[in-house]
Structure formats: structure tokens, C-alpha cells
Amino acid sequence: MSTTRTDRESVAVVGGSAAGLFTSALLARRGVSVRVFERVESLEPAERTLIVTHRMRSILSRGAESSILNEIRRFELFTDGRAATIALQDPDLIIERRKLIQGLADEAQKSGAQIELGSRFHALHQNGDGLAVEVERCADGSREEVGVQTVIGGDGAASRVARAAGWAPLETVPLVQAIVPLPKDMPADTVRVWFVPQDTPYFYWLIPESPTRGALGVIGESGPETRKQLEQFLEKRKLDAQEFQGARIPVYRRWIPVRRQFGRGSVYLVGDAAAQVKVSTIGGIVTGFRGALGVAEAILNGGVSRELKALRRELDFHLLLRRSLHHFEQADYSHLVDLLNDPAKKSLGECSRDDAWKLVWRVCLKQPRLVLLGLRGLLMRSKSIDKPGA
């Protein structure tokens, strides 16, 4: 990160999320006084198997390794009896969320951040030259007012910091996945994706976390209905769920400005609290880390951040992709798979999902008819992803 200011600031980070902890480490390394407030007594978040691009390694460096369970070398796409295989030039990573957060917490503390567990955010007030964060100690109910110049909300899609500072609530969608035995015919370095638009405008996935088990999941639009659809899909694939995992994921509909002036202080949002999620795939780990890089850069650089501008362009393009795909029918996905010639598949494997402009440009150069299919998807919007509940 490039910076131009060198004065020390006091920062309170609310929420021990991946993005919040990464922001804490970035600022603490630059000499900023950072206190992290997390309501749980022990940093043992719910386990969840996730897939990310290799870009996470370049962002976190060695800090990523402890959370990596497996590497993915290819994707298999299925729709209505058709299939396509995409070989990846750089492997995707299967990670475990709990291990990731615990590793980031260790890194933040080593960098100088102070993590205070069992501390629940209660309120935000103006306080002279800065802000006062009111924190409630979960053990005994006592409260403390902490004076800081900057507050960062890293407390997820239902961020209480965002509500206190005046941001509107976010819309979310349900993610449900089941841990299952890996099918005997499935290599451990391969992800399978099924497009079933009568069930979901997104897709089903099966990601292997080891040679013997994986996570089969789906994103839907209604929580109970999504769980039911997943159970039916498991039955159809003859897979038995060993356990279920779930979450509510924010839906990116437009760029959310990440900073607000609050009295004489500043409030920032990172990660899910700012809906920094690729809405094409509902993936938010790498984009959340980019949001953390941008917020840290802005705090250290007088509000200026090139990273945030680049992230906005990336998220807006993923929104365009989602608008194109959201109302695809089975025949459209079949046509999409049929259009994936060898040069197009090669380009898909060479470019990262976290560089969507480059990926789509190269793929469409190899198969121009994909442009017409995408435009048709944009014109099929009898109901729009931009409308809540659509």
C-alpha cells in the first residue's frame, strides 16, 4: 500500500471477521493503535468449507497456508446432459473458514493489534475530536466507552456498526451446503458445478476438501426452500449428508461507499458489511481482503485508495455478469456449454474469476457468439436482480 501520511491514529475494529482481522493487521503493521472487539468469548467460528482463487495466496502470503485444505486443478460443468471441463492454470484453493479466521487473528496480534473477545458493540457516539465506541463485556454486562478517531465495521452482513452510522440494511441470500463422502469417480482436485435454473438462478457445487469428502452446496433465494432443494439434490445424486453448514451472504446491487463522516471521526465498512461480494458467484473472501487493503490504504493515505476504485470496477462487472445469467433457462445453459470451444475453455482456465474483465474479454475473443448469448440474458429480465425479492 502506498501512503502519504505518517501520523498515528487510534482505530477500533468491530467484528472478528476475515476482512476485519486482515484490516487490523495491515494497520497495526504501520504503527496504528488498533483494538478489535469481538462478541464471542472464544474465537471458534462455525466451520465452513470455501473455495477461493489463487489470488488469496498473493494477498496473504504465508498467512494463507494454515487454512488451505486442498488445491483444485479443474472444473467440470454440467447442464442437461452436457458437460465441459476447464483446466486451471493456477489452482483454486479449498479453505476452512475457522482456520482462516484463527490464522488471521494470530497475524493481527503479532502485528500489534489488541483483540478483545467477549466484547459486544453497543453504540457509537460523537466524542470531542473523535468517536466513542460503547462496548459491553459479555461476562458481566459492564460497559466501557473507548475513544478513537476511526471505527471499522467488520461485523458482517447484519453489521450493527453500519446501522449505527446510518447505512441501510443489506439484502442477503441463503447459502446451504452439506458435507458428504466424495463420489468414487470424482478426483480430489476437481470441482463439479451443476446449473439447474428451475431450482436456483445460481448453481450447485461439489468441492472436495480431501480425497474422501467434500461440500455439496447451493445458493438460493429462500432459506427453507433452499435447504429442501439441497436435500432433494443430495437424494438424486445418492449422497448422504454428514453435516450441514449455512450462512446468509450479502447481495451486491451497487457500490456501497465504505466511509462516512461521523462527527469529527470516520466510520468505515469492510467485507460483508459493505457487500464486497462477487454477485456472479456469491464469493466474498478475496474481494473482502481487497476491501481491507483499500480501507487500510484510505486510512493511511488521507482517504485516497486506488484499491477501492479498482474493487468497485470489479464488483460492478460481476453485477453485470449476474444480470446476464440470472434469468437463464436450461436451454440457455446448454447453449453456453455447447459454445465453449477449446480456445474458450483454455482462456477460462488461464484467467482468474477475480479478474473478470480480463477473463470475459479473452473468452469472448475466442468465442464471439458468447457475447450474443450474454446480451440475450440481459434482455430476459422480466424480473430483475436489482429488485429485492426478485
Task: For the regions a language model picked out, list residue spans one by one.
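Predominantly flavin-linked oxidoreductase catalytic cores and closely associated redox partners
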Residues: 30, 107-242, 275
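FAD/FMN-dependent oxidoreductases across multiple families
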Residues: 123, 222-299, 304-309
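Active-site-proximal substrate-binding core of FAD-dependent oxidoreductases
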Residues: 296-337
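C-terminal auxiliary extensions adjacent to catalytic cores
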Residues: 333-390
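Dinucleotide-binding Rossmann-like beta1-alpha1 core, especially the glycine-rich loop
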Residues: 41, 82-103
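N-terminal FAD cofactor-binding segment of flavoenzymes
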Residues: 39-76
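Glycine-rich FAD pyrophosphate-binding loop
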Residues: 12-14, 25-47
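Beta1/beta-strand and adjacent pyrophosphate-binding region of the FAD-binding site
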Residues: 4-19
